[in-house]
Amino acid sequence: MAVPPSAPVPCSPFYLRRQEPCPQCSWSMEEKAVASAGCWEPPGPPRAAVPCFSVTVEQDDILPGALRLIRELRPHWKPEQVRTKRFKDGITNKLLACYVEEDMRDCVLVRVYGERTELLVDRENEVRNFQLLRAHGCAPKLYCTFQNGLCYEYVQGVALGPEHIREPQLFRLIALEMAKIHTIHANGSLPKPTLWHKMHRYFTLVKDEISPSLSADVPKVEVLEQELAWLKEHLSQLDSPVVFCHNDLLCKNIIYDSDKGRVCFIDYEYAGYNYQAFDIGNHFNEFAGVNVVDYSRYPARETQVQWLRYYLEAQKGTAASPREVERLYAQVNKFALASHFFWALWALIQNQYSTISFDFLRYAVIRFNQYFKVKPQVSALEMPK
């Protein structure tokens, strides 16, 4: 997809300074105590009032439940005029667009949570993250929640693919948007990263509920346990800052609006405070794609360096030094290992419970194989002095 040249990055301290706390971001003393104790999902800001409807939408027959919700959210729409469009790219949830006008300028997305995804996602925290990002201009409007999902505003633009996110004009926009999100912070003490608690939670599920039925292509549970301990020991020493992260920036979660010349990130169910380098490394892994995974598309060093320079200059408002870029480069590629491990565990759980048509087991094997393939090379990367 051809992308017109964009303006140079402004370099002033004002450009992406650390954002001021918003009124929704204050924590109670109880929440601070929970975060400091190392809960698996640090709490987000208190939820503002969002309508909640006692409607359950059937996984295999979304339309009737979706139309009940539309009657509440868009009472002026005539039922016979409502059009729908099913999006089939998602591998966690099911998504339906409801609209009347052809241009979809007013369009309600109805997202139905995937089967047993409460094992993977804290849905209460997802809504808080949605509101937090919306308060900072980084998310669409959240219209309501219902018993097994939520409804929100359709973001105008094109969902990107692996062939798009490697284009310099586009990856610059992605780097700037990630830098913006990484400046969002909660009041009070900084939460602990979600990574280790989530990975331990996923591993425990695999060990206790899934391991007897694991394919021979999947590493043994004892090996996974050793690797998880190794990751925590080595990556925790890298001093990567803890920031507010998207944590799931695959291509289809990036919407490009060519009219406005900007990108918007969608789907915040895995968002939360985490290591800066994990969010970036995870995105770099997504250059390989999901449905057809090809790690030859992992960004080359030159591409990464340019991407990281855009990111750092947006964050700092000044030029990034070679040492800063090299340091982040090493951190990002090391944390990309954790991304492989995280999503491989996730895929094993999805393989057990999900009703979505996707070969989760094959995906888990691909991610584990890539983890072990690149581990020696990545482990040898030295942090600049």
Curated annotation (Swiss-Prot):
<dbReference type="GO" id="GO:0005524">
    <property type="term" value="F:ATP binding"/>
</dbReference>
<dbReference type="GO" id="GO:0009791">
    <property type="term" value="P:post-embryonic development"/>
</dbReference>
<comment type="similarity">
    <text>Belongs to the choline/ethanolamine kinase family.</text>
</comment>
<dbReference type="GO" id="GO:0001890">
    <property type="term" value="P:placenta development"/>
</dbReference>
<keyword id="KW-0443">Lipid metabolism</keyword>
<keyword id="KW-0547">Nucleotide-binding</keyword>
<keyword id="KW-0418">Kinase</keyword>
<dbReference type="GO" id="GO:0001701">
    <property type="term" value="P:in utero embryonic development"/>
</dbReference>
<keyword id="KW-0808">Transferase</keyword>
<keyword id="KW-0594">Phospholipid biosynthesis</keyword>
<dbReference type="GO" id="GO:0004305">
    <property type="term" value="F:ethanolamine kinase activity"/>
</dbReference>
<dbReference type="GO" id="GO:0035264">
    <property type="term" value="P:multicellular organism growth"/>
</dbReference>
<comment type="pathway">
    <text>Phospholipid metabolism; phosphatidylethanolamine biosynthesis; phosphatidylethanolamine from ethanolamine: step 1/3.</text>
</comment>
<keyword id="KW-0444">Lipid biosynthesis</keyword>
<keyword id="KW-0067">ATP-binding</keyword>
<dbReference type="InterPro" id="IPR011009">
    <property type="entry name" value="Kinase-like_dom_sf"/>
</dbReference>
<dbReference type="GO" id="GO:0016310">
    <property type="term" value="P:phosphorylation"/>
</dbReference>
<keyword id="KW-1208">Phospholipid metabolism</keyword>
<protein>
    <recommendedName>
        <fullName>Ethanolamine kinase 2</fullName>
        <ecNumber>2.7.1.82</ecNumber>
    </recommendedName>
</protein>
<comment type="function">
    <text>Highly specific for ethanolamine phosphorylation. Does not have choline kinase activity.</text>
</comment>
<dbReference type="Pfam" id="PF01633">
    <property type="entry name" value="Choline_kinase"/>
</dbReference>
<dbReference type="GO" id="GO:0006646">
    <property type="term" value="P:phosphatidylethanolamine biosynthetic process"/>
</dbReference>
